[in-house]
């Protein structure tokens, strides 16, 4: 068996309780104070349990939080790009004592985990926004969420009990499962691809370029919470299935979902996404134009430049940077400024945002934008989502 890349921090975390320990915790949880998580916190909790956020074993305490916000490092000195926190109101925090256990519920009220609260601490919203998002503007979705959440963070280790029902069950692979599948297929090098947008020709081009140098591709669309105008995850997943069916060698692709919610933290989130994919077993990670960006808050290549300031050995996963890609009418092919000599008049600009805008207007993207099979899936999915649902009486 090929030696696999080590998880971040050296050990793949597993915070799931099983057998008698789980049964005892379930019984205990019935008597514990309950804290309901929002969608992002629930996704983070699931990923902590699965080891996707290794080396984290719970929601961050004050030392880790402050160090990550200020220095992009855990208190231990280990590289880590974004805080992973549990926010509650001041009133809720006053009812919880440090050292006691609480039960954590998903947004629907289903029990997910128990947590031993090691710390309660206030935090500076402005400082977190400025350092992590590069702005304090409430028009930024990450900042807006930060300004609306509770005033106190709870830190402490968690133990997972139940995984709430979720879509795409066949694609919800844990890091241990993706690593096992990579080993089964004999992949020594694996490139991860993160996306929240509908698949288009630029994505296809980048993925195939990466497959020229790696044994396999982990196509890892994010299916957690996104902006309201982002395409529904169910529609995107059907589009990924359609393009894999007709345009990729299936034996070299593993399609799995990434449960995380989007932070829209641009450069920092690009590093965070890379570290997560390292935990899933990827040796390489694609960072394209405006990775994890939103609006005009970041420059188009800020998410690539941040890696210039990181020690490659400490990062432990190789980023693959791609320039802006387009369809060149003269070349009759996908290209980038590195491979095409023709001017702007020959270039058809491609982006997930542009495809999304056309779809919402009811327009089928041209074949230079996306494959016809994919366009059909996207159009049908959006029309079904917009169709009024009948109500039986």
From Swiss-Prot:
SUPFAM superfamilies: Nucleotidylyl transferase, PUA domain-like. InterPro entries: ATP-Sase_PUA-like_dom, PUA-like_sf, Rossmann-like_a/b/a_fold, SO4_adenylyltransferase_pro, Sulfurylase_cat_dom, Sulphate_adenylyltransferase. One of its GO terms (molecular function) is sulfate adenylyltransferase (ATP) activity. Its EC number is 2.7.7.4. One of its GO terms (biological process) is sulfate assimilation. Pathway: Sulfur metabolism; hydrogen sulfide biosynthesis; sulfite from sulfate: step 1/3. Gene3D superfamilies: HUPs, Sulfate adenylyltransferase. It catalyses: sulfate + ATP + H(+) = adenosine 5'-phosphosulfate + diphosphate. Keywords: ATP-binding, Nucleotide-binding, Nucleotidyltransferase, Transferase. CDD domains: ATPS. It is an enzyme of class 2 (transferase). Pfam families: ATP-sulfurylase, PUA_2. PANTHER family: PTHR43509, SULFATE ADENYLYLTRANSFERASE. Belongs to the sulfate adenylyltransferase family. HAMAP family: Sulf_adenylyltr (MF_00066). NCBIfam families: PRK04149.1, sopT. This is Sulfate adenylyltransferase. It comes from Symbiobacterium thermophilum (strain DSM 24528 / JCM 14929 / IAM 14863 / T).
